[in-house]
Amino acid sequence: MKHPTRTTRLAVPALAFALALAATACAGGKQDEKGAANSGKGGRLTIATGPTTGVYYQIGGGLAELISDNLDGYRATAATTGASVQNIQGLQAGSYDIAFSLLDTAQDAVEGKGSFDKPQSIEALTRLYPNYTQILVRADSGITSLRDMRGKRISTGAPNSGTEVIARRLLSAAGLDPVKDVSAQRLALPESVDAMKDNTIDALIWSGGLPTSGVTDLVTSLKDKVRFLDVTAQLPALSNTHGGVYQKGTIPAAVYHQPADVPTIVVPNVLLVKKGFDPRLAGKIADLVYDKKNALEKVNAAATEIDPAQAGNTAPVPLNPGAANALKTLTQRP
């Protein structure tokens, strides 16, 4: 796995466009227009992303721009959401056409467990970049391990987010009850950052690409008043319970200007659609992700870790047939 070696500034025009897209996104849209889009006849496509200071939102806006500019008859918009769980629920309800999700949450969805009471009819367009578990604690909190979070005020992520799924699993792996043993604050990233600045929480748990602008803001503002927490001691317990979806990774020191690299736990992201999504359109969107990857990299450096060699590795989530056909040719491209 390649890791970024420096913090990359967001391209201002691309980010501005992404912000505009998300600000004007309509989750529902006109059902006839959306139905036509899903069947490959042109129309509006709504992409479910995440909070405004997260990477899903930025790269989702970039993808919406690529679709609108390169696929005749389509206009795509990026919707701000609570992220993974909400995104999958929205796919099922028909509120969104395309969705970003962590693979562990998507695995729960197809297996009908965790936040999902029955298997969800979803398919993948491609695997994306990895999310890094980024846990920041106040330097004066006394927290040096997850077990030290007992009785502390912890942001476990927004309701129905992939971050919340990982946060609860990590706390459980450390021997803590995520509901009873910590004062869990179910905050989205922007609110978590504000709460850390205001000293109303002791730590935040976040799962996102590198760099995440909200995390950059926090460490830039508070400097040595916050520090990252190494949680890799919980990896064996996570793997024993949830399989191989979790892996060890590293947050390079240069990304957030830290004194040393931070060992952490990573999980892949996937781009999802509802089963039955037009295969020709699915193939075109999958092609765009790789043919125009450099444009996504300008929006956020996390896109540099979108790996063509891993594009089809979305198990246990099945690939959309059209996307699967498109991805077969990736390694043959110049």
Roles of regions detected by a PLM:
Residues 27-30:
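Bacterial signal peptide processing site
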Residues 22-25:
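C-terminal motif of bacterial Sec signal peptides marking the signal peptidase cleavage site
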Residues 103, 112-115, 141, 178-271, ...:
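Pocket-lining segment of extracytoplasmic ligand-binding domains
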Residues 2-14:
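Bacterial N-terminal signal peptides that target proteins for export
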Residues 42, 73, 83, 93, ...:
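Extracytoplasmic
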Residues 44-70, 74, 78, 130-198, ...:
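Bilobed "Venus flytrap"/periplasmic-binding protein-like clamshell domains
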Residues 262-334:
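Segments of small-molecule ligand-sensing domains
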